[in-house]
Amino acid sequence: MYFCQMFLRMIKKALLIVGMLTVTLSCSEYQKLLKSDDTAQKYTRAEELYNQGIEKDSDKSLKRSLRLLEQIEPQFRGKPQGQRLAYMVANAHYQLEDYYLAPFEFERFLQLYPNSDKAEEAEFKMAASYFYRSPKYNLDQTDTHKGIEKLQIYLNKYPDGEYSDKANEMATALQTKLEKKAFEIAKQYHKTQYYKAAIASFNNFLADNPGSPFREEAYFYRFDSAYLLAINSFQVLMEERLKEAKDFYETYKKYYPEGQYLPQMKDALEDINNRLQNF
């Protein structure tokens, strides 16, 4: 029994050593290949590593492939293999979630090979890169605007394309993020008691975003801003502002007759009506 255990340990150690030697040799061969001038061998190995990276979702293989691809791709432009190599460079960046280089490479691919059978995929992934780059709503939204623009270009070119459903979902999500930003800016004016600015911001928001999921809440905060502005106004301004707040209440009720904010709005409305009796 003891000798069996010893034998098994020796086998495990031997296998481990063989594995380590294989990895070392593999790394050494790869480094030699990087420094060599053998373009054909680089092409073959780059494609092997790329396919391995895609099939096994291996970042390591994709990164290795990319280093080789970037060395040889310029040499194949205008040749039959050029299109394949340019696509692999762009898609490797995309699969590695490098959403800053990926759209640049896909755009270059489309400029070089506009009639490629990979054109639709490249157009979508270029647009999707901006979607993944888009930050939280409270940060700068340049990439969000760019993403909407690029997704719309894709949808215009391929209205029934393979990725059209996903592109629509992404565009909607980005648009909602922009609406969230605009809504929160207006809401911040309300919170900090800049009621005039809040009313103006909510008016703009409602005019610009007719289908927004934040629309009901915007109507409520517009009313509440107008009400709070009115009751804190000088007497000479109060009547006009109370009437405006009442109009905002009626607008909310028209669009949301069973709205979630009606109970608290009715209390404010009663106060408005009582105050208006003094004029």
Feature map (PLM): residue ranges:
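Acidic, polar-rich low-complexity tracts and alpha-helical solenoid repeat scaffolds
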Residues: 2-7, 11, 26-279
